[in-house]
């Protein structure tokens, strides 16, 4: 974080003890990842935890979809410790608070999701509550949460209250709408209970695949915590960021916007790739905070003609991608400019223009290509997520190439082919491993490909499920047919 003296000041937070690796306070910003192995496969989980730790991951999260998986965390932890690795393990819990109770016995931290901890899973139904009825719902949450906090207190287990935009409850959505205020209140309800019962070993996160929603919501959360005299440390991440260059840029735009403002105590770069590949990217973001805070400040001072201009001196392409996205992200998200120019000797102008376009798209300023929202996968994913993403991207690219060839061979059909591909620019396709955030993220996507059962997929258009339980080997073709059916009407 060098080269940023005078431009970067970190938000004050209290220390949360996660095993032997504390976060918050004056501790370094921690980097972490999550396994994508089946939690009942102890050997595979141990091996992947060790790979993540060897890459530099400081916490490793595993999905615990049931009590059986939570119980198996004991064996996974034993295997990791026998290998001489002390990395803290985190259980990821949705839908069943009993699972969190069990996981707290064996893990250094447990993540719970306010959207489905006590509230029913999201059904996109509008619910009417009187103030008294709403207060009664909060009492139900408190009655269930307090015994869990007591277990955590007795076993020195930390808690992450992790809100996902894609899994807000119908209760929250009905009262606050699909807004940053609703996302923040979903978190604050739980934090107030923790404060009331003097349980402070809590880290919090607010994540979304939409970088604008994520940044605005985290900023609002920080403001609300300050009003209520809370100093909980923050975990940052852009959920379902994708893979490859797009995933890295989107993560750098969202996470970097906040890091350069001094917000964030631990980060995860969620990529639809092998989880150990997330760690070097996360480390680069942390190491670049000071420099990017300076670049952001200088770029803001020289905005002209609605354009952010960045001047960098990188020799490594990935470092250039990440630093440019970090430095420009907040300026674009906040609407201070709507164009971006990047200067960096050693890379040709065409490549730099494409990078600028990708950053503009990640900041949701200008859409020049199809956007893919894809989760990193976890033990809940029952199909080949990474391979599917490649096949869907390839299918879209084949269609674009086919129409481009027609235009080249038959110039008279140029306007026809432009019209035929116009819908692919800015089209949002969500490729989700399971039902936790899948249906919720459909609200921000045009089409969705969501894991249903082992080897089976459901296809969505917006919030509506169009086809259920399609065999995996047929699903990509069916998705393309669905897009063709609706987009060419």
Language model regions located:
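Glycine-rich, proline-tolerant flexible connector loops at the mouths of alpha/beta enzymes
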Residues: 36, 56-80, 114-136, 202-211
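Catalytic alpha/beta core domains of metabolic enzymes, predominantly
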Residues: 128-141, 173-410, 428-430
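Conserved, mostly hydrophobic/aromatic
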Residues: 31, 92, 161, 204, ...
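Glycine-rich phosphate-binding active-site loops on the catalytic face of alpha/beta enzymes
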Residues: 58-61, 107-123, 261-276, 336-349, ...
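Alpha-helix-loop-beta-strand connector modules within alpha/beta enzyme cores
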Residues: 68-91, 140-156, 221-230, 392-396
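N-terminal amphipathic alpha-helix/helix-capping segment at the start of soluble metabolic enzymes
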Residues: 1-33, 149, 153-155, 291-305, ...
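Glycine-rich tight-turn/loop motif centered on a GG-T
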Residues: 108-144, 171-181, 467-469
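N-terminal small/glycine-rich loop or linker at the start of catalytic domains
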Residues: 13-37, 73-74, 157-176, 310
């Amino acid at each position: 974080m060098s080269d940023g003296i005078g431009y970067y000041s970190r938000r004050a937070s209290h220390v949360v003890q996660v095993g032997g690796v504390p976060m918050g306070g004056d501790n370094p910003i921690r980097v972490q990842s999550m396994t994508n192995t089946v939690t009942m496969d102890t050997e595979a989980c141990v091996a992947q935890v060790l790979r993540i730790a060897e890459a530099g991951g400081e916490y490793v999260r595993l999905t615990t979809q049931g009590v059986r998986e939570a119980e198996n965390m004991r064996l996974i932890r034993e295997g990791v410790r026998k290998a001489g690795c002390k990395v803290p393990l985190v259980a990821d819990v949705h839908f069943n608070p009993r699972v969190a109770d069990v996981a707290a016995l064996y893990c250094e931290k447990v993540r719970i999701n306010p959207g489905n901890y006590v509230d029913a899973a999201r059904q996109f139904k509008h619910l009417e509550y009187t103030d008294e009825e709403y207060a009664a719902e909060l009492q139900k949450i408190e009655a269930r949460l307090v015994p869990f906090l007591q277990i955590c207190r007795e076993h020195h287990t930390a808690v992450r209250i992790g809100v996902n935009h894609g899994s807000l409850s119908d209760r929250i959505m009905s009262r606050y709408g699909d807004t940053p205020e609703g996302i923040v209140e979903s978190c604050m309800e739980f934090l107030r209970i923790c404060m009331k019962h003097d349980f402070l070993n809590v880290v919090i996160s607010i994540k979304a695949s939409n970088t604008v929603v994520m940044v605005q919501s985290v900023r609002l959360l920080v403001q609300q915590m300050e009003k209520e005299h809370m100093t909980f440390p923050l975990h940052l991440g852009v959920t379902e960021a994708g893979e490859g260059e797009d995933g890295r840029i989107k993560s750098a735009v969202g996470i970097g916007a906040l890091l350069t403002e001094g917000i964030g105590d631990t980060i995860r770069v969620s990529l639809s790739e092998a989880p150990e590949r997330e760690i070097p990217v996360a480390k680069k973001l942390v190491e670049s905070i000071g420099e990017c805070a300076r670049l952001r400040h200088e770029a803001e001072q020289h905005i002209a003609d609605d354009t952010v201009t960045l001047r960098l001196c990188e020799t490594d392409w990935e470092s250039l991608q990440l630093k440019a996205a970090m430095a420009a992200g907040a300026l674009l998200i906040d609407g201070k400019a709507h164009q971006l120019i990047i200067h960096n000797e050693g890379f040709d102008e065409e490549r730099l223009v494409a990078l600028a376009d990708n950053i503009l798209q990640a900041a949701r300023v200008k859409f020049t290509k199809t956007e893919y929202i894809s989760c990193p996968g976890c033990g809940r994913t029952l199909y080949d997520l990474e391979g599917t993403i490649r096949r869907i991207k390839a299918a879209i690219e084949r269609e674009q190439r086919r129409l481009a060839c027609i235009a080249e061979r038959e110039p008279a059909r140029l306007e026809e082919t432009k019209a035929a591909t116009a819908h692919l620019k800015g089209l949002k396709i969500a490729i989700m491993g399971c039902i936790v955030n899948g249906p919720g993220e459909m609200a921000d996507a045009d089409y969705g490909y969501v894991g249903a059962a082992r080897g089976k997929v459901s296809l969505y258009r917006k919030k509506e499920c169009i086809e259920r339980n399609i065999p995996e080997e047929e699903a990509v073709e069916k998705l393309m047919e669905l897009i063709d059916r609706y987009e060419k009407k």
